[in-house]
Amino acid sequence: MRRMGLLLMCLVILTACAALTVGREFPAPAKDTIRNGVTTKAELVRLFGEPTQVGIDDGDTTWTWVYFKHGDPQLTKQLQVRFTDRGVAKSYSYSSNFPEDMRTLK
């Protein structure tokens, strides 16, 4: 019984130390990947996978892709696309603190 409790406690500690991720990894969009007034929802799904979140902002449909990796340091990237009534990109924003993005986007 005591051994089982010790084993359970070790498993809890090891699980707490594991890296936590939220969302799916997706590539940073190149500057010409998303073209306002041209890029469709289907193209975005092909490029980045299904969005993590969907919503409405000031009457426009929005899709958001989020990837969070807990560790030291904590890393986050987010892509948000706003759509026209026709379902094409109206505007988008991308932010990240991943080292590779920090180097290429600065």
Tell me the role of every PLM-derived stretch.
Residues 13-16:
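C-terminal motif of bacterial Sec signal peptides marking the signal peptidase cleavage site
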